[in-house]
């Protein structure tokens, strides 16, 4: 692989969707040819050093919590390009750091790749930000996208003929798989027994729709007695969800686990019978689900899924085959999907098996990484 510099404001140990996305890709690229320029996490340089020491490639941290296309970031990037003979610069999130594309070329890089996610769609709706997107895409050789939805929203701002590459998250089908031992252990931890259980594993933010699950739950329990809802994760919406749980007439059937260790995430998916995250677009279209890696992980684990209609989320599901796609704002549709799946073990088994087969066929890492390397190496 050509010598590559990843410039990103989104990198572990900070937790988030883009952080996980870049972590998954960088760990699979040839380490000797990769350098990362990243910000320092809120936990401080010690946390960054501890994380980076376990990586096979070099990570250069700037002493700031956020990288922006400022003169100091530009200068540091250009110095790395010159000192390490970098040929390809990859901006892990196109906006806003992709504005440094021209500066990367000025320092000697011959190729620029920018990766888009969900937030660039928000930028595309703001007049001033649209101009920035046009400039970012003009300076790039390749624009990657995580879903057909995001590509459709962003292509009008790209120059004619700009090369695009589908580069969604893959799923590790060895890590996320049916796991009877983890399922048994965690169901015992939370006192689930043999209860039909819906799990939602995600960051707690309003877009994800955990509040809709809690709101729908009394009607679900009425039709599926003994059903349990387990919401896994942490985030700014945690306090709101805790309040909704306390006010629910079926609060005893709802569990909020809080944050769990990363190595326990696959097991928390596996302990469920159904995975549901009825995500919905918010903020007049500014806050949208770019894809939804959690749906892929649930399918790989052999669970039927219920996904919302926001952004690219429906692209992770074969509707009616691996799960159901519902409008996250339609409580009746959500209740119907939850009850249908919880009430029919045969349906759950068929959907789960189909989901696992789909992940193995279309969403595994080797082919996705090969496509990225090909884009990096192209002349």
Regions flagged by a language model, labelled:
Residues 149, 170:
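Carbohydrate-associated surface elements
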Residues 192-208, 214-218:
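Conserved donor-binding/catalytic core segment of Leloir-type glycosyltransferases
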Residues 318-320, 324-331, 340-346:
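Conserved acidic donor-binding segment of nucleotide-sugar-dependent glycosyltransferases
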Residues 226, 333, 340, 347-361:
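A short, well-ordered alpha-helix in the C-terminal region of glycosyltransferases
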Residues 91-97:
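Short His-centered aromatic/hydrophobic patch
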Residues 276, 295, 300, 304-307, ...:
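Short hydrophobic beta-strand element within catalytic cores of glycosyltransferases
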Residues 239-266, 274:
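Nucleotide-activated donor-binding/catalytic signature segment of Leloir-type glycosyltransferases, i.e.
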Residues 270-288, 303:
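Acidic donor-binding loop of glycosyltransferase active sites
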């Amino acid at each position: 692989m050509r010598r590559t510099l990843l410039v990103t404001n989104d990198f572990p140990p900070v937790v988030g969707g883009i952080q996980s996305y870049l972590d998954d890709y960088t760990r699979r690229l040839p380490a000797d040819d990769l350098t990362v320029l990243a910000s320092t996490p809120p936990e401080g340089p010690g946390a960054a050093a501890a994380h980076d020491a376990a990586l096979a490639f070099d990570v250069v941290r700037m002493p700031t919590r956020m990288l922006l296309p400022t003169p100091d970031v530009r200068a540091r990037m250009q110095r790395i390009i010159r000192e390490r003979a970098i040929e390809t610069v990859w901006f892990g999130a196109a906006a806003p750091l992709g504005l440094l594309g021209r500066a990367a070329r000025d320092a000697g890089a011959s190729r620029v790749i920018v990766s888009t996610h969900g937030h660039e769609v928000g930028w595309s709706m703001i007049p001033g930000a649209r101009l920035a997107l046009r400039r970012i895409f003009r300076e790039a050789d390749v624009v990657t996208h995580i879903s057909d939805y995001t590509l459709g929203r962003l292509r009008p701002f790209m120059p004619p003929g700009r090369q695009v590459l589908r580069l969604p998250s893959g799923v590790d089908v060895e890590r996320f798989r049916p796991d009877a031992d983890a399922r048994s252990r965690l169901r015992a931890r939370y006192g689930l027994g043999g209860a039909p259980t819906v799990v939602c594993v995600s960051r707690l933010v309003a877009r994800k729709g955990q509040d809709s699950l809690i709101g729908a739950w009394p009607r679900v329990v009425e039709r599926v007695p003994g059903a349990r809802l387990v919401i896994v994760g942490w985030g700014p919406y945690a306090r709101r969800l805790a309040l909704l749980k306390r006010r629910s007439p079926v609060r005893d059937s709802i569990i909020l686990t809080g944050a769990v260790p990363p190595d326990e995430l696959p097991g928390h998916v596996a302990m469920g019978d159904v995975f549901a995250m009825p995500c919905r677009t918010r903020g007049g279209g500014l806050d949208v689900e770019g894809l939804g890696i959690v749906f892929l992980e649930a399918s790989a684990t052999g669970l039927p899924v219920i996904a919302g209609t926001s952004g690219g989320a429906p692209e992770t599901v074969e509707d009616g085959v691996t799960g159901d796609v519902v409008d996250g704002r339609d409580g009746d549709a959500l209740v119907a999907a939850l009850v249908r799946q919880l009430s029919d073990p045969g349906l759950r088994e068929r959907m789960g098996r189909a989901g696992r087969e789909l992940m193995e066929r279309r969403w595994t890492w080797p082919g996705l990484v090969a496509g990225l390397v090909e884009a990096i190496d192209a002349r």
